[in-house]
Amino acid sequence: CVGSRDTNRCGNGYCSSVCCMYALKESMIAKEHAHGDLDCAIFNMDIRTFGKDYEKYYLRARDKEGVRFITARVHTITEVPETGDLILEYADNSGAMKQETFNMVVLSVGLQIQPGTAELAKRLDVKLDKYNFVESDPFTPVNTSRPGIYTCGVLQGPKDIPESVAEASAAACLAGAELAEARGTEIAKVEIPEPIDVYGQKPRIGVFVCNCGINIGGIVDVPAVKDYAATLPSVVFTDDNLFTCSQDTQDIIKEKIIEHQLNRVIVASCSPKTHEQMFMETLEACGLNKYLFEMANIRNQNSWIHSKDPEAATQKAKDLVRMSVARAATLHPLHEKKIPVIKRALVIGGGVAGMNAALGLADQGFPVVLIEKEERLGGMANHLTATIEGADVGSYLEGLIEKVTAHSQIQVLTRSLIVGFSGFKGNFTTEVLVGPGMYERKIDHGVVVLATGATEYRPKEFLYGKDQKVVTQVELSKRLKEKGAKDLNRVVMIQCVGSRNGENPNCSRICCQSAIKNALHIKKHQPDTQIFILYRDIRTYGLLEDYYTEARKQGVIFCRFDPEDPPTVESSEDGIMVTFKDHVLDSDLRVSADLLALSAGMVAEDTEELASIVKLARTAEGHFMEAHVKLRPVDMATEGVFVCGTAHSPKLLSESISQALAAASRATTFLSQPELTLSAVTAQVNADQCASCLICVRSCPYQVPRINEDGVSEIDVALCHGCGVCAAECPAKAIELNWYEDVQILSKVDALLEGVM
């Protein structure tokens, strides 16, 4: 919290949202690179690992990697003249002064808006808040005070990469709606050179070895790997680069392909999952078929897991490159198929996220079918009263429902259940049982947006359900709206109920601000009410920190508790008796409360059946898993399927709205195209060898193979996902997967075992 959560030194009262996580990351990387026992300590006020699966990362750092976490603000740093070491002085939880000596001190520096950026916003007549972030409404998070100008990323408020990427897509969605009528009028066609005919040519392989900064180069002897590659058969050019994925290096690769007449290209770097497509496009720009490309993953499969043995990592990198060279020599061009796109979207889930996604698509001119399993739209928002900023959720929800149901491009199906799903990107078919009569309907659509939402955890602990004086924060909000706070003299709130535990290790993100919102509401209408908030870490990230500060000013008492020694709750005639340990007094406190409010976490809706029908990956907690946490935060691994809102992970209403618009924006990139390209990596059947044994039919996770009228297996390449299960299972070797043919796989195996057998 250097430069954040500090109104005394720098005036930045907000939390910068990213500092805890990058301190965690850097400490773990430091321990990996130290090649020995390195003591890493993180001094903190609160650990704010509130993102999706961030808490698991924190637990790994603390419990497995041995990073120490000290809850304290450092008072003084003094240098030891003789050694240059640094002495840190701080007060521990009991108030006692402590000292520790370190070789290095790293400051987790926060984020702030540059003066030039603030000046630009003012020239554009865009309103800023007191910290120079763009003012926005919780229900229109990427809109600014000036119509037609949108905001995203840190300019809107402190946030990390996934939220910034999603907000960028959300802003693009709203801008796209304004420009919908002009779609397609300003497209510049990318000219791709005539493909080079490589049939009959001997392989001429180029190998580009990447340092990936220090991720690879800090462990592997990259120049040695490059020199080794030059000795391999058919390799005519080698090079090493700091970052092979950079635009400069892409241009160099193009130059070298032409200069050395390369007809196969290998990049030895990171994961093909994130970078393969980019390198393939580089080949296409030179006229080379994109499937004449091979990638050796010498980072994830090598330097990261052998970081303590550089010599072995270097040898393994050579092995991986040798294997890739052997496979590259067997590659041949493959050709992709074009398919038309059904210009309709299916949105599953009629909560705030689902409705905003539907509007984001419909306002750009695309028909939308919105499916909701309940009778009423709104989802969890039907149980919410107001945001922490004071915005009325109920009136917003009514307006949103009215807008959706009245939209000419949106068809709403309530009380509907999905029972079947088939197809591929741009051409899906979903079977739905609609209404009380459960009549069957088939919907053809080009994309899917998942917005199935989440629900409040129903506590099993702290006497919830056994004593009427124990409620959740959602129930308390409703009570305050209906009855006010007149009868409340003392209230206790317990945080992290149903979150950050064995069953649900993640932070539910909303609980701290929900507690503070209700506490401020009570204090506003009943200032003399005593309020105790028992917490593990207060996670009012970003601009929410101001509300935490205000709650303290209003006299709300915050007491930290250890999860190993949680509060205990008993019913009594006078109310609810809560016992907890106060770390400052180092003794147990007993508080008799009129009401106990549990900050219950957020749990995913039951998504198991839907995930099974649509064939989608989920986290252990039941949330849908995105394709890439940072680069593709709303895309699913299945192309044409997108996720948003609390179906993705717990989040605030404003964040769900941003992510819904982002999913709509990403879906538009499919719907706006006249046709889509199918991957050439599909399974092919040799009918002469097929024994009609049905093993491929039974083993395919997507139910693609079928036995045709000739009695042999047939695989529709448009439906094939290229997973290769059928090719691996076929006992007659009648099925082969393009780009993973037997000769290509076996060439790698032979190269690996070279000199061994």
For each feature predicted by the language model, list its residue ranges.
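Residues forming the flavin
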Residues: 1-757
